[in-house]
């Protein structure tokens, strides 16, 4: 029986989702692309025939995320702080040029990345993707336009090594929907929190 003929059956919907990234309020997330996987194919030719074998499995990384940028909490600053906390230093003196990012710190700074697709009542994650070893390789702060009344947007890419699709489970709305404590930077570059 098709799902639309059964009143108890409900298809997964593209607008029912929560993306959890440390320090980023869930309500600022506008769009997210889900993970994908590709298995390469190796061909072997014998006489007049071609036989195909599975090769390496790679995850289609990065995923793309679009966020709106409120004044408070300042998502633009939060994302820049994540890049800086991962090891980036402004090149203001010779000593700063010796510092660079490491994967360990970049992954730790992002504080995890989980995409939850929700049930109709919002209490259950019918699909939960956990991106492993995820970090930010790209942040695009958007465009400004005198002729536009649109909300300011930021686009980020999140790269990862692999993704795990977890079992369905309950969603804790107090964690998913509340404005998280957002890190900001004071004039001396020290990380503070507000929220």
Feature map (PLM): residue ranges:
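Glycine-rich, low-complexity intrinsically disordered segments
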Residues: 1-195
